Amino acid sequence: MKSDHKEFKLKDSVERIDQIISSRDDCFAELDGIPSRNSLTFTNGFYVKCSVLFVNIHEPAGLNDSNPQTENLKLYRACVSEAIAVMNSNEKCLEINVVENVVSGVFNTPWRENVDDVFTTAAKISSIVEIINCKFKKNCSKKATLGMGLSYGKALMVRAGYRGSSVTDVIWMGDVIKEAATLATYGNKEPTDRETMVSELFYYNLSEQNKKLLTLNSFRNCYNGDVLNSYFNNWQKLNCP
């Protein structure tokens, strides 16, 4: 959220606090899908069923130094750029956020085939990063690796921020968000961890064909796999061997 530097007034602050305290407790409806942002006020909210994808871009050595190597920064930017581009191409993706080395998306998935589409989105991101690594290998000594977490469940969607200013945003809360974020940290962490980590409920909603691409990771209590998009993968073999 970009600041707009409005004067802080204690009287107005107390009024805003009182409005939040006095807001009704029954104004949080449960929905099967994600409503428009315009439906949100500073006193209501929605419990919505959704799918969440977190992409953890494991940082190349030196990226957090005070003067990161240019090649590392370019590699990071390319991964963030294309992860966002792939998520944005999915019409069910309603929210995209970037915090440090993590790109996340919230998807409206009222039908099981929509969950499969999110799984396909993750596979495309995995494949595009393989292409990025191939493109960078002549100029960059580092290689980008990912950890991806996919989860399905209920999230709380609320508007939060400074009422009366432009410093507001939609906030997503709930176990489904935390679960996807945690699973992403497991991706490629240990030799037994694959790149794409999928929650049990997300796995349950996948097609039988997609389920076959994953195996049980009993240590992480999830399913995992190294899943690529066949079209992207074939392009890489032909154009970036």
Predicted regions: what they are:
Residues 36-120:
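Catalytic NTP-binding/metal-coordinating core of nucleotidyl cyclase/transferase enzymes
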Residues 6-32, 59-78, 118-132, 147:
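Charged, low-complexity, helix/coiled-coil-prone segments
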Residues 26-28, 32-35, 39, 44-47, ...:
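Mixed-charge, polar/low-complexity N-terminal
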Residues 1-39, 179, 188-241:
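Intrinsically disordered, glycine/charged-rich C-terminal tails and inter-domain linkers
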Residues 3, 13, 22-23, 36-39, ...:
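Generic serine detector
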Residues 111-229:
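Catalytic beta-strand-to-alpha-helix segment of the class III nucleotidyl cyclase homology domain
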